[in-house]
């Protein structure tokens, strides 16, 4: 049974709550999950917001598996992730077939609410509507719990690098102010990235506005970003410590909004092949079943990192395999230690790590086993249907014989990346007020 306090969830709309109310989380923590100090969340008022996702209609379907793998690895190149040369060659060949050239190399040297997100084909990216400025300017951003910059295509971006994206124009906002002397740079190991200058302005998500939010306006972007016409940039939701603005790092949208939210948290309810959503300031009891199981967050490297004790494949025996993992909505795949990936695919008779394709592949006709992650005693089950990520030999599951797996090796990273493959299977609570993360089974799954 769930013990959500409905009054606490709606207090932002109804007015101030009594000085003392039961925590909205009472009864939600599993007895087997490690409890966190300062468990009770005081609900004294504030806002809530819902941010639904929207479809990226410009997504290119062709050979999505290796492309998603490269994007996942390059994001964490600073932490030791390496992109195998054969995989880069595969990407160059794909881009050549698409007539896009070598895009990987042209680098740069308070409230509660809900935002909805809709996936690209094969769920490679989730986008959500955001408004910036006064009057509000609409942009569509990728909500990313694995980074901490809010950056956008803007009127400062060279026209040759804008390819149909909605842009932010500071000069048309009465609340925009230049943050003099501030700059930002995001660079990946393959040389791609973006950089620019910084403004402060009103940012609105799901009807909740944050004034004086740092908005990083791109003055240079790599071609790999420019080709995605539906995405205007990123809204980072990791820790402030890894924001790239110099000389002084800036706070994320969530950090600035947190004090005004009914609860100092947000949730991610990502789905397979249909719109999901992010909720800020409240927990929607209709989106999960059973208990929410919390474990502490290790924020030392700026991420929503937590301990996973092990895993099991299908109905097989549980394996003791302790490792740090990062919950990252901005990474498509689930990247784990090579031993863990190999142990999973060892239970898939047709699976092979195919250098010509760029990762683990298998016969599309094969029914994949589930993968269960043991997190603080909670068993998070990822169905095999989600792990069957994309066709590898054609552009459609209807005609494909070989499929690309959603679980791949992390090429030496000191932690695993629990990206969208994992998050589509687990309702996730990012509790910034208590520095913990919670997981629960999704409703209807």
Where are these regions (language model features)?
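Solvent-exposed loop/turn segments at secondary-structure junctions
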Residues: 145-150, 156-159, 193, 220-223, ...
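Glycine-rich flap/beta-hairpin and adjacent strands of clan AA aspartyl proteases
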Residues: 211-289, 388-444
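Signature of the N-terminal lobe/flap region of pepsin-like aspartyl proteases
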Residues: 105-115, 120-213, 217-219, 368, ...
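Short strand-coil-strand connectors
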Residues: 130-137, 204-211, 262-264, 314-319, ...
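Aspartic protease catalytic domain
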Residues: 17-52, 59-62, 70, 77, ...
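Flexible, small-/acidic-enriched active-site or ligand-binding loops
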Residues: 277-322
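Aspartyl protease active-site motif detector
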Residues: 126-172, 203, 230, 234-238, ...
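Disordered propeptide/prodomain
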Residues: 2-139, 295
């Amino acid at each position: 049974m769930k013990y959500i306090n409905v009054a606490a969830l709606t207090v932002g709309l109804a007015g101030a709550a009594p000085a003392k109310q039961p925590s909205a989380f009472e009864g939600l923590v599993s007895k087997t999950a490690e409890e966190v100090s300062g468990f009770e969340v005081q609900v004294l008022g504030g806002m809530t917001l819902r941010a639904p996702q929207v479809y990226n209609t410009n997504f290119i379907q062709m050979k999505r598996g290796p492309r998603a793998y490269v994007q996942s690895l390059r994001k964490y190149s600073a932490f030791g992730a390496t992109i195998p040369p054969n995989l880069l060659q595969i990407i160059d060949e794909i881009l050549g077939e698409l007539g896009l050239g070598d895009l990987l190399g042209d680098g740069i040297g308070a409230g509660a609410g809900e935002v909805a997100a809709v996936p690209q084909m094969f769920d490679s990216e989730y986008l959500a509507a955001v408004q910036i400025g006064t009057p509000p300017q609409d942009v569509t951003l990728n909500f990313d719990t694995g980074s901490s910059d809010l950056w956008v295509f803007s009127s400062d971006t060279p026209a040759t690098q804008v390819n149909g994206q909605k842009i932010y124009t500071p000069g048309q906002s009465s609340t925009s102010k230049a943050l003099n002397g501030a700059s930002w740079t995001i660079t990946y190991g393959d040389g791609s990235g973006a950089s620019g200058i910084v403004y402060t302005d009103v940012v609105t998500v799901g009807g909740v506005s944050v004034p004086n939010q740092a908005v990083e306006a791109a003055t240079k972007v790599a071609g790999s970003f420019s080709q995605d016409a539906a995405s205007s940039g990123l809204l980072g939701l990791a820790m402030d410590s890894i924001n790239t603005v110099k000389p002084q790092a800036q706070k994320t949208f969530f950090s600035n909004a947190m004090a005004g939210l009914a609860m100092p948290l947000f949730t991610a309810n990502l789905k397979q092949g249909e719109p999901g959503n992010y909720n800020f300031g409240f927990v929607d009891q209709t989106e999960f079943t059973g208990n929410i199981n919390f474990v502490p967050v290790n924020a030392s490297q700026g991420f929503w990192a937590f301990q996973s004790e092990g895993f099991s494949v299908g109905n097989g025996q549980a394996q003791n395999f302790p490792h740090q993992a990062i919950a990252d909505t901005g990474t498509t795949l689930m990247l784990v230690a090579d031993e863990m990936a190999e142990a999973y695919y060892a239970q898939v008779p047709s699976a092979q790590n195919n250098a010509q394709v760029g990762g683990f592949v298998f016969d599309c006709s094969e029914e994949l086993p589930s993968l269960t992650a043991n997190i603080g005693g909670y068993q998070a089950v990822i169905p095999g249907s989600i792990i069957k990520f994309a066709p590898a030999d054609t552009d459609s599951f209807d005609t494909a014989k070989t499929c690309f797996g959603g679980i791949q090796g992390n090429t030496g990273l000191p932690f695993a990346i629990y990206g969208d493959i994992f998050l589509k299977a687990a309702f996730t609570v990012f509790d910034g007020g208590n520095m913990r993360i919670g997981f629960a089974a999704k409703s209807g799954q």
